[in-house]
Amino acid sequence: MNILDKVDAASLRDDIPEFRSGDTVDVHVKVIEGQKSRIQVFRGVVIRRQGSGVRETFTVRKVSFGIGVERTFPVHTPNIDHIEVLTRGDVRRAKLYYLRNLRGKAAKIKERR
């Protein structure tokens, strides 16, 4: 194990729940505005999980006021307070980019039992 692996292992978080593409999650993000800090919740469907180790990221998509919003988060960043898994999605793909072209009920994901 070289020095870079030790640094990476020290910065990994262990409080991340199991989630994958298709799951609906609440990401509680720390937002700093001036001197004040607050928690902002970003709720949406995980459309991608990519990478491994400290460089792992995931992308969450939601529709806000009729406009699709996607946000990519590093999994092990200290800016995420915690991640809450609301529902487990039943999908057959690892990357759900096709959801970008679907509207309304067609963009719904079945819940896994």
From Swiss-Prot:
GO CC terms in record: cytosolic large ribosomal subunit
UniProt xrefs under Pfam families: Ribosomal_L19
Gene Ontology molecular function, alphabetical: structural constituent of ribosome
GO biological-process terms attached to the record: translation
SUPFAM superfamilies cross-referenced by the UniProt entry: Translation proteins SH3-like domain
Highest taxon of the lineage: Bacteria
Role of this protein: This protein is located at the 30S-50S ribosomal subunit interface and may play a role in the structure and function of the aminoacyl-tRNA binding site.
HAMAP family per record: Ribosomal_bL19
Name of the protein in its database record: Large ribosomal subunit protein bL19
Species per Swiss-Prot/TrEMBL record: Corynebacterium kroppenstedtii (strain DSM 44385 / JCM 11950 / CIP 105744 / CCUG 35717)
Organism classification: Bacteria, Bacillati, Actinomycetota, Actinomycetes, Mycobacteriales
